[in-house]
């Protein structure tokens, strides 16, 4: 346990085709068993499908979809005097991004469809239009935080 200085957060290199750091992070999160080439192939195929369906540039569609899914607040359990309260807390930007990505990927994996790129494209388009499982999860999180607003003074 070093005590000299804080370690800076490593920023992954941007992806090759779209030169986007956010897309590179998403690809890494989607990867299973270290198969990055497979994850990259799935993601690029997914973005091509998005472009065919919308007729727009796929990267702004992906970015907007991620923005629509990122939560602003979440609830954390806090034990006070023998009872546990769900305390709403604001989320820092890096965690918001990570949760949004995780929810989109999880929803796409649970979706029914032919291939992962098809399911992922459908989920991203749903998130872009503010619908779908990942967006619903964000709404549920916000609703839970709103319901427990009375306990916000227990923040730490």
Curated annotation (Swiss-Prot):
NCBIfam families: rpsG_bact. GO terms for cellular component: small ribosomal subunit. One of the primary rRNA binding proteins, it binds directly to 16S rRNA where it nucleates assembly of the head domain of the 30S subunit. Is located at the subunit interface close to the decoding center, probably blocks exit of the E-site tRNA. It comes from Treponema pallidum (strain Nichols). The gene is rpsG. Pfam families: Ribosomal_S7. Keywords: Ribonucleoprotein, Ribosomal protein, RNA-binding, rRNA-binding, tRNA-binding. Belongs to the universal ribosomal protein uS7 family. The keyword Amino-acid biosynthesis does not apply. Part of the 30S ribosomal subunit. Contacts proteins S9 and S11. SUPFAM superfamilies: Ribosomal protein S7. GO terms for biological process: translation. This is Small ribosomal subunit protein uS7. CDD domains: uS7_Bacteria (cd14869). One of its GO terms (molecular function) is structural constituent of ribosome.
